[in-house]
């Protein structure tokens, strides 16, 4: 009986070391990207970010194109409520700008806060869920990691202030084929 308990403890401890305390429910991707064999997406693309699975998926006119591992704000994957809560917002957005970034290689900004974000924010204020003087925040987007820290993505370590972070090579690929105006859905 002692050996079963010891084995279980070692197994649990090892999994926490490898995956961290907040690994995604679907770890089958092992933080690798997957994509169709075609070299680039066909026609209009859209992006779906699944916070529970730690995945950013790209769809084009043929359907699914690619999936990349990503991480978010704080370890709690709840919806963003206000500025400073380190949460990644949920909802429907668009890419509004693209630029080279001095820290994170590239930055694809989304239109947070948009009308949907403001409606949720004001409803939360009205219900007293957030302070009356809270602000909604902004400057949310998709970006890379700190230089030489792509391993953070492999370990599913949430570290941003609310943005979506991905490995440098994956980000450069996404940046190359994603136009301004692209639809981005972020869900839990």
Predicted regions and their residues:
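Well-ordered beta-strand positions in beta-sheet-rich domains
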Residues: 46, 67-69, 92, 139, ...
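N-terminal post-signal-peptidase region of extra-cytosolic proteins
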Residues: 31-46, 51-52, 72-97, 124-128, ...
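Bacterial Sec-dependent signal peptides at the C-terminal "C-region" and cleavage site
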Residues: 12-29
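Positively charged n-region of N-terminal signal peptides that target proteins for export
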Residues: 1-4
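Short Gly/aromatic-enriched secondary-structure transition segments
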Residues: 63-75
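Exported/periplasmic cell-wall-interacting domains
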Residues: 99-188
């Amino acid at each position: 009986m002692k050996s079963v308990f010891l084995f279980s403890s070692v197994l649990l401890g090892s999994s926490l070391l490898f995956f961290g305390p907040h690994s995604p429910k679907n770890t089958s991707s092992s933080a690798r990207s997957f994509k169709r064999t075609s070299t680039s997406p066909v026609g209009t693309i859209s992006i779906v970010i699944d916070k529970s699975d730690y995945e950013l998926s790209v769809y084009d006119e043929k359907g699914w194109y690619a999936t990349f591992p990503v991480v978010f704000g704080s370890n709690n994957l709840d919806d963003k409520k206000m500025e400073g809560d380190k949460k990644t917002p949920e909802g429907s957005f668009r890419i509004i700008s693209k630029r080279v970034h001095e820290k994170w290689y590239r930055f694809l900004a989304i239109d947070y806060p948009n009308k949907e974000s403001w409606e949720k924010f004001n409803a939360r204020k009205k219900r007293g869920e957030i302070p009356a003087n809270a602000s909604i925040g902004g400057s949310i987007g998709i970006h890379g990691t700190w230089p030489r820290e792509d391993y953070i993505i492999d370990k599913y370590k949430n570290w941003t202030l609310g943005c979506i972070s991905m490995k440098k090579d994956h980000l450069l690929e996404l940046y190359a084929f994603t136009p301004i105006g692209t639809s981005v859905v972020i869900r839990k």
